[in-house]
Amino acid sequence: INGDAKGTVFFEQETSEAPVKVTGEVLGLTKGLHGFHVHEFGNNTNGCMSSGPHFNPGNKEHGAPTDGNRHLGDLGNIQAAGDSPTAVSITDSKITLFGANSIIGRTVVVHADA
């Protein structure tokens, strides 16, 4: 997370076949929806610009978390109240912490807008 926003996010997956539970909180977001995505690279030397595009090993179209055809990194939006920490609570069955398409070592980006 770059800029005035900061936070901690946890990824938990019990087995390679289980969904990933994403929990945590982000501070400093403006009121409204903010895109929440895993990007391709774990490089933040130049802020989010160094993180590359959304993680998309299947070369699919951008989509919502419930879409069958979507970037693996498309985890939807989080809703910020603007005056308090923003909770992150996502369960996703497409991302994984195992194997070649693991998100481990990649960058989580919270976008300014949805």
Curated annotation (Swiss-Prot):
Q: What is its main location?
A: cytoplasm
Q: Which cofactor does it need?
A: Cu cation; Zn(2+)
Localization terms from the record: Cytoplasm
Pfam families noted in UniProt: Sod_Cu
Q: How is the cofactor bound?
A: Binds 1 copper ion per subunit.
SUPFAM superfamilies xref list: Cu,Zn superoxide dismutase-like (SSF49329)
- The residues that hold Zn(2+) are 54, 62, 71, 74
Q: Which UniProt keywords apply?
A: Antioxidant, Copper, Cytoplasm, Metal-binding, Oxidoreductase, Zinc
Question: Segment Disordered: which positions?
Answer: 54-80
Q: Where do the annotations place Cu cation binding?
A: 37, 39, 54, 111
What the entry lists under InterPro entries is as follows: SOD-like_Cu/Zn_dom_sf (IPR036423), SOD_Cu/Zn_/chaperone (IPR024134), SOD_Cu_Zn_dom (IPR001424)
Question: Quaternary structure?
Answer: Homodimer.
User: What name does UniProt use for this protein?
Assistant: Superoxide dismutase [Cu-Zn]
Which organism does this sequence originate in? Answer: Drosophila tolteca (Fruit fly)
